[in-house]
């Protein structure tokens, strides 16, 4: 896995707290708004982004009304994500502004609009994985990492 930038400290439910687990953060739930741990738990994460747990810290768990009672301290990063792009943009090592391609095939939605990336994100192309077809056209499937502003 390609990792750029520093790990982010956050809290996740005990059942999810395993290295390698990926999740999408959708924003704080109602109980988070008044929780004393919200700053470290949800305050470090960006809604709509994908995160991957690198390490579970060996600290005691904390109580939480959402995660079946307990959360653990973990280190997370934004992982690389696969996305289909226009072939002319597919140059390994280049940084592009992400522009999603329309694809009418619902089974390929995750390749053309993957969760964790937004239209207009700056991304670095890590690897070119191959071709993917949709609507009679061929696109390049690439692995990208988001570049933070």
Curated annotation (Swiss-Prot):
Pfam families the record matches: UPF0179
Which InterPro entries does the record associate with it? UPF0179
Disulfide-bonded cysteine pairs: these are none
Family to which the UniProt record says this protein belongs: Belongs to the UPF0179 family.
The name under which this protein is listed is UPF0179 protein TON_1048
């Amino acid at each position: 896995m390609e990792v750029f930038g520093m790990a982010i400290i956050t809290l996740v439910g005990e059942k999810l707290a395993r290295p390698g687990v990926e999740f999408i953060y959708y924003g704080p739930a109602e109980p988070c708004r008044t929780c004393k741990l919200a700053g470290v738990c949800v305050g470090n994460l960006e809604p709509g982004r994908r995160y991957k747990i690198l390490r579970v810290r060996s600290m005691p768990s904390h109580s939480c009304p959402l995660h079946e009672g307990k959360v653990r301290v973990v280190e997370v990063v934004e992982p690389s994500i696969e996305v289909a792009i226009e072939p002319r943009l597919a140059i390994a090592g280049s940084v592009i502004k992400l522009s999603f391609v329309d694809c009418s095939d619902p089974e390929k939605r995750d390749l053309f609009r993957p969760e964790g990336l937004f239209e207009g994100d700056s991304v670095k192309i890590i690897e070119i994985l191959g071709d993917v077809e949709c609507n009679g056209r061929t696109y390049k499937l690439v692995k990208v990492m988001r570049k933070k502003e």
